[in-house]
Regions:
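Alpha-helical membrane-protein architecture signal
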Residues: 218-228
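Hydrophobic alpha-helical transmembrane segments of multi-pass inner-membrane transport and secretion
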Residues: 1, 226-237
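Basic-flanked hydrophobic alpha-helices used for secretion and membrane insertion
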Residues: 2-220
């Protein structure tokens, strides 16, 4: 979405329009779209039922966490960089699911079915949100190559990434105003040859003010996995 900040008599306020659940459903219903994901990103902390922190290898025990609708469509999984090795992906009907890496699960004695509590900032009055680990992923990379195990854009080791249900992230970030709103979403199409026509149909949805949003085509995932999959999809952002 587009927008920014402006000032008025009562201070500064956001001019950005965010993506609503209704918009997601309308776009997902367009013929030719096979699935979508939408995310909210934050760096919460997780705690075991004993009250002990779920620890990382970093200076703090926070996890770089995506609050997701459908983790199956996240580009880290779709491109093959992450592989779900236990449990299931987070889906739209899950409200409290959590996926963590095998490294952090083993370090903390956690497994699929373990209960944890998520808090965006445990040093404030942020709410405690009950979650359950539904999946465990492995970073598919050369573990001797530091560049493939670390995301320079976020400064987080990939093993300290996590994925939770969008509803759980919204609950954790309830004190942060626009911090729990969706700013972007990714949609997959079933046939790359129909990409342009699908985009045109999406942009013809009259209930969405397209002056406030940018639509781009991105085939990175398609290029990365087209040789491995027979039903490869192409990404629309």
């Amino acid at each position: 979405s587009t927008g920014g900040w402006t000032s008025g008599a009562h201070g500064s306020y956001s001019t950005q329009e965010f993506i609503s659940d209704e918009m997601l459903q309308e776009i997902a219903a367009v013929d030719g779209i096979s699935g979508y994901d939408a995310s909210i990103v934050s760096m919460p902390y997780y705690f075991k039922e004993t009250g002990d922190s779920v620890v990382t290898t970093g200076y703090t025990n926070s996890f770089y966490t995506y609050g997701y609708v459908n983790t199956e469509y996240n580009d880290l999984f779709a491109s093959g960089r992450f592989e779900l090795v236990e449990g299931s992906h987070i889906t739209e009907d899950m409200t409290n699911g959590l996926i963590i890496s095998r490294e952090r699960a083993e370090q903390n004695g956690l497994e699929v079915g373990s209960k944890v509590v998520g808090i965006n900032d445990p040093y404030t009055d942020d709410p405690e949100v009950d979650m359950e680990i539904v999946g465990i992923f492995e970073v598919v990379a050369d573990k001797n190559d530091e560049a493939t195990m670390y995301d320079a854009s976020t400064m987080w080791d990939f093993s300290e990434y996590a994925f939770c249900s969008k509803a759980a992230m919204e609950a954790m970030c309830v004190n942060y105003g626009d911090g729990n709103k969706i700013q972007e979403a990714d949609f997959f199409v079933t046939d790359a040859a129909q990409l342009e026509s699908v985009i045109n149909e999406v942009q013809s949805i009259s209930s969405i003010n397209w002056d406030h949003f940018i639509v781009t085509a991105n085939d990175e995932v398609y290029q990365n996995i087209s040789s491995a999959l027979s039903d490869t999809t192409t990404l629309v952002t």
